[in-house]
Amino acid sequence: MKRFLFFMALLCIWCISFNSVKAVSNAELQDTSRFEHIVSKGDTGGGDGKYIELSTLKDVSTSGSTKSVEAKIYVVLPSSDLVREYTIHYDYNLNYSFAHLVAKVPEFKQQFPDFYLGEIWNIKMDNSGIVGTVKAQQDYTLNGESKPTKPGYKGYEYVTFLTPTDFDFESYHVANRVFKKVFGIFYDDVSR
């Protein structure tokens, strides 16, 4: 029994050494062959920003009406000496893309005679069509050293810089940019 426990402990140590966390520094994020800076309205110009790790972008779609993407996105917060890595999964309901809703205006007007184009904004505010789920997160210092990842506050575990993806908010623009990197077109330009 002791040999078995010793072997299991040795196996765990061996696995951990091969699966160690790969830290990312702020300097590495500037490598445009590996990362793309997402220029967004939330950037203050003080060195903060969001970066997509290009090699992690994956189309994981399983349905025709919903496109799904997984990626690693890094959020840099210099004032907190923090680079936060998010592994995120986005689901995009193509029936709620802006272009698709505009194409349906004649149908909406038939059902609701007072319907006008501005109502699409209200539809998008009620349901953006994008759902983002954080699958994992890891914190690093700006120099790339691992840092303990703090859990979210109770009730806010899923509120991040990237989720929820409410229409016309920062997180929505980031998700739209991720969609374009994978499919070559912005989510809101897709017409079914």
Task: Please place each PLM-identified region on the residue numbering.
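N-terminal secretory-pathway/extracellular module detecting exported/lumenal segments
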Residues: 23-87, 91-192
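N-terminal prepro-regions of secreted/extracellular proteins
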Residues: 10, 20-25
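Positively charged n-region of N-terminal signal peptides that target proteins for export
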Residues: 1-4
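Intrinsically disordered, low-complexity regions enriched in Ser/Pro/Gly/Gln/His and often acidic
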Residues: 7-8, 114
